[in-house]
Amino acid sequence: MLTGVLVLKSAALFVLAALLEIGGAWLVWQGVREHRGWIWAGAGVIALGAYGFVAAFQPDAHFGRILAAYGGVFVAGSLLWGVVVDGFRPDRWDLTGALVCLVGVGLIMYAPR
């Protein structure tokens, strides 16, 4: 079972992973789809590569568990990114779906075993 400190570390790593992956994908999108240039896309590729290392620092030893749980963080984080960066307005179903995903994260990562 994870201690409080390890849960906080794990949660912080999930937030960092989300910033790197979602931010990296957004930078690639800006570079390619919004024609901002290859420097934007290149920065996105670097961020996406850095994201790939973050999972290795999770306190849980099971890659599949970590990546499955991160999927829920990615869903909620992507919606939040859209709100903050792109002016997206999620509807109640977006928010409900994100909440379900985050409950899943809690169960997958932090339920007693």
UniProtKB/Swiss-Prot annotation:
* Compartment(s): Cell membrane
User: SUPFAM superfamilies, per this entry?
Assistant: Multidrug resistance efflux transporter EmrE (SSF103481)
The record's Gene Ontology cellular component field reads: plasma membrane
The record's InterPro entries line, in alphabetical order, gives: UPF0060
Which superkingdom heads the taxonomic lineage of this protein's source?
A: Bacteria
Report how it sits in the membrane.
Multi-pass membrane protein
Segments passing through the bilayer: 12-32, 37-57, 66-86, 92-112
Recite the UniProt keywords alphabetically.
Cell membrane, Membrane, Transmembrane, Transmembrane helix
One of the Pfam families matching this protein, by short name: UPF0060
Main localization, broad class: membrane
Q: Does the keyword Ribonucleoprotein apply?
A: no
Return the similarity comment.
Answer: Belongs to the UPF0060 family.
User: What is the protein's name according to its record?
Assistant: UPF0060 membrane protein Mkms_2558
Q: Name its species.
A: Mycobacterium sp. (strain KMS)
The beginning of the lineage is: Bacteria, Bacillati, Actinomycetota, Actinomycetes, Mycobacteriales
